[in-house]
Amino acid sequence: MANTVEADGSNDEGYEAAEEGPEDEEDEKREISAIRSYRDVMKLCAAHLPTESDAPNHYQAVCRALFAETMELHTFLAKVKSAKENLKKIQEMEKSDESSTDLEELKNADWARFWVQVMRDLRNGVKLKKVQERQYNPLPIEYQLTPYEMLMDDIRCKRYTLRKVMVNGDIPPRLKKSAHEIILDFIRSRPPLNPVSARKLKPTPPRPRSLHERILEEIKAERKLRPVSPEEIRRSRLDVTTPESTKNLMESSMVNGGLTSQTKENGLSSAEQVPAQRKKLLKAPTLAELDSSESEEETLHKSTSSSSVSPSFPEEPVLEAVSTRKKPPKFLPISSTPQPERRQPPQRRHSIEKETPTNVRQFLPPSRQSSRSLEEFCYPVECLALTVEEVMHIRQVLVKAELEKYQQYKDIYTALKKGKLCFCCRTRRFSFFTWSYTCQFCKRPVCSQCCKKMRLPSKPYSTLPIFSLGPSALQRGESSMRSEKPSTAHHRPLRSIARFSSKSKSMDKSDEELQFPKELMEDWSTMEVCVDCKKFISEIISSSRRSLVLANKRARLKRKTQSFYMSPPGPSEYCPSERTISEI
């Protein structure tokens, strides 16, 4: 507590005064009883202060503070009183419903003015002062502070002197160090810790690999492939054999004189049994494998057929060759499916049609197994025709490849790519007034002259055969087939073959005139197809039909020649041959 030694020897207000107890109280009672005038009161009040000269200023400040507090209390009570009166008036207004007259009186009232100010402040927003903007005066003016505030100000500014406190007749020692330093000393007094380098930690357990890391390792690891010799690869590519190819090999071996008649008979019987025994499913090869196998087959046929002269046939267009390369993804046994033409029909046709009576005489009566395979081969399953979806995919790939040819001509390439130029004629440009037609097959814009109408189903395309779209294309294929027949007639020296040609023609017509049922074509609608796509479809249909017809002809021809040179049955061994109704 702030305490200074008084000059007049008056009692102190500190702890010693509290310890003196009843003696001080008795002295105060005597002094109070001795007060008889205002001067005695002033002297008594001045004795409470450390210096008597500050008494007038101090008590004037106290009086001012008390007066200010009383005035504030008076104004507050007046406002409360006026607010109560106004509230009573409002209640009376609600009762009397005379709001129009009372509102004019309330305009001049204080509470209405204050309410307007409050609403204005709420609308505009009240700006609060920051703490830094407040200027705190450490030495305020005396008359602005109350005695309690003045005392707290003295304590904050440390304007006081403390008494010496004695403990057991001696001054207690001060704390030499702070609590933080004591804690640090305690930590240092403990035994030292081992350095990190000297510690031996346990090995970290292996972290399990995540799924992403395992997938990446499998991708980076090389696949272990089974070693395959090149002979097996060649054998798997060139393993597709027909009875005609085995017969050609037998004929070439007979011309060279390397085999006897006994080995020839055994070879023929084994060659005829191969189609019946080897019945496995073939997967559709990719375009790269087809190209590689085609190049190998062409080199092989060039080496084997060096002595024979192939007849002259007109070359088929490029689109037909590409379309015939792509096989349908349907799996058929080799014995029951004739292989489609792949730039080899002239050689096959030549090998069949160039037969001589000397070669035919070497045939032996076929066994039951070989005759059954011949019957299956004579009437193969009509699976050579591609589906509509496959043809659409082939056509779109060809159109995309055809578009890449025009990359060197930037104007034409950009016009074709953006659909501003006809894709067929490449002369007609499209504008705002001349619209384009979109081909439903190749999905390319074409002009009205290059657009044709064609009946197409809505969907699905995956199971629908391609020959169902265009019977007219089939008729064109038949006419082209008939035009090719006279050119190959002089290659058939056998009269027996010519004798059975009339029957085969009638049967071929019945096979070729197969059309899609009209009941299933009722819901088909006419759609726009470009000229190139229509020609492409007709060529695919004609080529597939042509290969099917040729396969049927070869099978029937071989069966007829074998039955012709077989020994005639006796009267007891007579057995009627099994023939279909169409043959009869």
Curated annotation (Swiss-Prot):
SUPFAM superfamilies linked: FYVE/PHD zinc finger (SSF57903)
Region: Spir-box; residue ranges are: 384-404
Compartments where located? Cytoplasm, Cytoskeleton; Cytoplasm, Cytosol; Cleavage furrow; Cytoplasm, Perinuclear region
Acidic residues composition bias: which ranges? Answer: 9-28
Q: Name one GO molecular function term.
A: actin binding
Q: Which residues carry this modification: Phosphothreonine?
A: 337
**Does the keyword field hold Cytoplasm?**
yes
| Functional note | Acts as an actin nucleation factor, remains associated with the slow-growing pointed end of the new filament. Involved in intracellular vesicle transport along actin fibers, providing a novel link between actin cytoskeleton dynamics and intracellular transport. Required for asymmetric spindle positioning and asymmetric cell division during meiosis. Required for normal formation of the cleavage furrow and for polar body extrusion during female germ cell meiosis.
This protein's assembly is summarised as: Interacts with FMN2.
Q: What is this protein called?
A: Protein spire homolog 1
Where is the organism placed in the taxonomic lineage, from the top? Eukaryota, Metazoa, Chordata, Craniata, Vertebrata
